[in-house]
Design a protein with these regions (language model features):
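Extended alpha-helical scaffold and adjacent linker segments that couple domains
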Residues: 1-441
Length: 441
């Protein structure tokens, strides 16, 4: 007897022989484990990997274990979107939209036959050498689940409880042996996780505090990012580099902070990180003149000709849920493009047309008041209306300056503006004194 018939009284903490327990559950599990197919073992393995990789039960493609997934592009401090798939490339669905990468966990027991095309966007994880302990946990887990599926009442609960015990043991083994038990293949090169991570501080890359422990998922993400770094650089060579980590979870907040800063709100560290990465800052000043992204927008608008607008679909391309600005070179997502457009509105270079309104430099508050989704669905951009030269001439004449300076100012020359500012500055003390004299009678 293996202890199956021993029970503990909850009130006295005493053990006793329980003759009502007429089923030896452990023996049933052992017996079923001997008859398990490789496919059943693979399913059990994937259950453990799913828990360790923190995958949700919400599958976009029923029947396929595939999830949208993010990996950090470590050199640029930004997450890239891709897919995590349990299985081989020839088994995954082809309907999903293209992303930047695929991470595959290959079946360890019923190994699939497929040709690795050494593609730059594919990373393969294989369990190399499960020992007897792991095989025992795995088979016990699969057997207990199998028995639970046909049992009922108390027996079902016992089998499910034993399955969870085995799953915990299996997960613990995978966590502890991960670095040597897994091989990672990228573009035909196969190494253990340990070898891939040589010379790299995984804890530092995972940004862990001194008390935090690196987990299974962190290691997979960091090593995948190391392998895919060149791939990310190849498909978006001039993508921005951020000073804070931009994730799918925080990017809406970061971009919102940047837009609020452009609208006159507090310029937070996050806002500066976004504006600076998009080259919209010259020191503390917002100035898109040196931003390659802003200048690309302006050159496209200029190419349309005088008085023409630049439509949204002339700036963003791709399917409705995956759009990019200049996908070959910059590969900017719509929220980052909107920030660039906001910088150009701020500088007076652009008017942003959205549903029911046009945002120019006099309506910057709209960048904060409108939702990011609304701004991302902008209609078009256009050049601001030309300055009224007659009014500008009158202004220069009012301050005893040559009216011809108005023409130069309207063409972007800064010298007339400086002269006008000097005249205004000289007049301010006189105006203040006059106001004070009037108050004193």
């Amino acid at each position: 007897v293996n202890g199956q018939f021993i029970s503990k009284a909850p009130d006295t903490e005493q053990y006793y022989l329980d003759l009502k327990k007429d089923i030896d559950y452990d023996a049933q599990i052992e017996k079923r484990a001997e008859a398990l197919s490789d496919d059943a073992l693979d399913r059990a393995y994937y259950s453990a990997i799913k828990a360790l990789m923190e995958c949700s039960d919400d599958l976009r493609y029923p029947g396929f274990q595939i999830w949208q997934y993010q990996v950090e592009w470590q050199e640029r401090r930004v997450e890239r979107m891709g897919y995590l798939f349990f299985g081989a490339p020839n088994d995954r669905p082809t309907a999903q939209p293209e992303r930047d990468f695929y991470i595959y966990f290959i079946q360890p027991f019923d190994r699939p036959k497929f040709s690795d095309a050494n593609l730059a966007d594919e990373v393969f994880f294989r369990l190399k050498s499960p020992d007897e302990d792991y095989k025992r946990y795995l088979s016990q887990y699969a057997a207990a689940l199998d028995l639970a599926s046909t049992a009922s009442g108390g027996a079902k609960a016992v089998y499910l409880s034993k399955a969870q015990d085995s799953l915990r043991s299996m997960s613990k083994w995978l966590q502890e042996k991960q670095m040597t038990a897994f091989e990672v293949t990228y573009q035909g090169k196969t190494k253990t996780l340990q070898d891939w991570a040589k010379g790299v501080s995984l804890r530092e890359r995972a940004r862990l505090g001194p008390e935090e422990r690196i987990n299974f998922r962190d290691v997979v993400n960091i090593v995948s990012g190391l392998a895919l770094g060149q791939r990310f650089a190849d498909i978006a060579p001039e993508y921005p580099t951020f000073s804070v980590l931009v994730t799918e979870a925080n990017r809406k907040q970061l971009v919102g902070n940047a837009l609020r800063a452009l609208a006159g709100g507090t310029r937070t560290k996050d806002a500066v990180a976004i504006l600076d990465a998009l080259e919209l800052l010259d020191g503390d000043r917002v100035d898109p003149a040196n931003s390659r992204y802003a200048q690309e927008v302006l050159s496209r608008l200029k190419a349309k000709g005088h008085g023409q607008v630049l439509n949204r679909n002339e700036l963003l391309s791709g399917s409705s849920d995956i759009e990019y600005f200049a996908p070959i070179k910059y590969r900017l997502e719509p929220d980052l493009l909107v920030t660039v457009l906001g910088g150009l509105v701020y500088s007076g270079d652009l008017v942003l047309s959205i549903t029911g309104d046009k945002i120019d430099s006099g309506k910057l508050a709209q960048l904060a008041e409108r939702s990011l989704e609304e701004l991302k669905q902008f209609k078009h951009v256009e050049a601001p209306k030309e300055i009224n030269l007659a009014v500008l001439r009158a202004l220069f004449e009012l301050f005893d300056l040559p009216s011809g300076l108005a023409q130069k100012a309207s063409q972007g020359d800064t010298e007339p503006v400086i002269k006008l500012q000097e005249k205004v500055s000289a007049l301010v003390p006189r105006v203040l004194k006059a106001g004070s004299d009037l108050q004193q009678g």
